[in-house]
UniProtKB/Swiss-Prot annotation:
Residues 1-4 form the signal peptide. May have a role in chylomicrons and VLDL secretion and catabolism. Required for efficient activation of lipoprotein lipase by ApoC-II; potent activator of LCAT. Apoa-IV is a major component of HDL and chylomicrons. Belongs to the apolipoprotein A1/A4/E family. GO terms for cellular component: chylomicron; extracellular vesicle; high-density lipoprotein particle; low-density lipoprotein particle; very-low-density lipoprotein particle. Residues 17-314 are annotated as: 13 X 22 AA approximate tandem repeats. It is found in: Secreted. It comes from Papio anubis. This is Apolipoprotein A-IV. Residues 343-401 are annotated as: Disordered. Sequence repeats lie at residues 17-38, 44-65, 66-87, 99-120, 121-142, 143-164, 165-186, 187-208, 209-230, 231-252, 253-270, 271-292, 293-314. The lineage of its organism: Eukaryota, Metazoa, Chordata, Craniata, Vertebrata. Homodimer. Residues 358-392 have a biased composition (Low complexity). Synthesized primarily in the intestine and secreted in plasma. Its main location: secreted.
């Protein structure tokens, strides 16, 4: 089966959340850093995601914790320095753009409008899908409640036998539909990421003529913007997924209660069944109302981030805490790199040392192949011998006559 894993993204999120909690601008991060606390949080993540630790996870955990602690300390120390670097970078970019302040502001404004136009169809589709999928979920589940009520009326004498399959089917249907729901809704976040890349690239091209020799520094600022915007897309995906799981957790006990009530009296079961349809409807509707605005809120957040960039690059920028997103990007890049290296090394090690049963199997296969080759070689040698003997017989035949 598929191996449960702790991802680079989950580890980076734990680290960044902890880093952010220490101080809003990480000034006092070094003083407050508690190695043991970060270690506990990472260990808790492994425990939560994997339950019992397998060899792979144990090895990863052993190597990851010292790496994470060291990276955390470095980030805390680099924070002040990076803040100063970003401030200088912004000053230089602003100085280059200042003579064209109105045009730059106008170009960013045009990009904001283009971004909204790009995202609008997807936001509408997401909203439509939320409504369609929740309606479908309701249509799929309601008949089970009605069917069970009918079975109750018709088979009062043999309730357990008659109703249990329906209760089991309801549980399976809930799981299946929630998975389908997630499968339909979460891909929108990836579509949004593609649109973000297009928008930022167009913005880079439209601002390039004004940046002159500060082009590289402007590109760096735009990388920071793209990172923040894509992070929003990831959060949207996580939020949809979490809401779908929450819906499953609210619906699943309804099926469990039905199965439990089969052992009780008919009156209690009748009451539960009468309420089942209403409960299903209510939970599905709550999910719809909660998730429906997600797309629109996501759009607003992206527009706000573009507006913040316009402010940062404008003549009246003020003091902006712009370095933290770069710090987070650096952290996530380093954690991703650590995971890639670890997985690469693990796959190399696996080819060298397979688990015992696999090793034995491989050895057995090798032995069988060697045996086959030996037998083949023997047959060839025998054949050659026979051919040589026949040749000798043919050569001697004229002499004998």
């Amino acid at each position: 089966g598929a191996r449960a894993e702790v991802s680079a993204d989950q580890v980076a999120t734990v680290m960044w959340d902890y880093f952010s909690q220490l101080s809003s601008n990480a000034k006092e991060a070094v003083e407050h850093l508690q190695k043991s606390e970060l270690t506990q949080q990472l260990n808790a993540l492994f425990q939560d995601k994997l339950g019992e630790v397998n060899t792979y996870a144990g090895d990863l955990q052993k190597k990851l914790v010292p790496f994470a602690t060291e990276l955390h300390e470095r980030l805390a120390k680099d924070s002040k320095k990076l803040k100063e670097e970003i401030r200088k970078e912004l000053e230089e970019v602003r100085a280059r753009l200042l003579p064209h302040a109105n045009e730059v502001s106008q170009k960013i404004g045009e990009n904001v409008r283009e971004l909204q136009q790009r995202l609008e169809p997807y936001t509408d589709q997401l909203r439509t899908q939320v409504n369609t999928q929740t309606e479908q979920l309701r249509r799929q589940l309601t008949p089970y409640a009605q069917r069970m009520e009918r079975v109750l009326r018709e088979n009062a004498d043999s309730l357990q036998t008659s109703l249990r399959p329906h209760a089991d089917q309801l549980k399976a249907k809930i799981d299946q539909n929630v998975e389908e729901l997630k499968g339909r809704l979460t891909p929108y976040a990836d579509e949004f990421k593609v649109k973000i890349d297009q928008t930022v690239e167009e913005l880079r091209r439209s601002l390039a003529p004004y940046a002159q020799d500060a082009q590289e520094k402007l590109n760096h600022q735009l990388e920071g913007l793209a990172f923040q915007m894509k992070k929003n897309a990831e959060e949207l995906k996580a939020r949809i997924s979490a809401s779908a799981e929450e819906l499953r957790q609210r619906l699943a006990p309804l099926a469990e209660d039905m199965r439990g009530n089969l052992r009780g009296n008919t009156e209690g079961l009748q009451k539960s069944l009468a309420e089942l349809g209403g409960h299903l409807d209510r939970h599905v509707e709550e999910f719809r109302l909660r998730v429906e605005p997600y797309g629109e809120n996501f759009n607003k957040a992206l527009v706000q981030q573009m507006e913040q960039l316009r402010q940062k690059l404008g003549p009246h920028a003020g003091d902006v805490e712009g370095h933290l997103s770069f710090l987070e990007k650096d952290l996530r890049d380093k954690v991703n790199s650590f995971f890639s290296t670890f997985k690469e090394k693990e796959s190399q090690d696996n080819t060298l040392s397979l688990p015992e049963p696999e090793q034995q199997q491989e050895q057995q296969q090798e032995q069988e192949q060697q045996q086959e080759q030996q037998e083949e070689q023997q047959q060839q040698e025998q054949q050659q011998e026979q051919e040589q003997q026949q040749e000798q017989v043919q050569m001697l035949a004229p002499l004998e006559s």
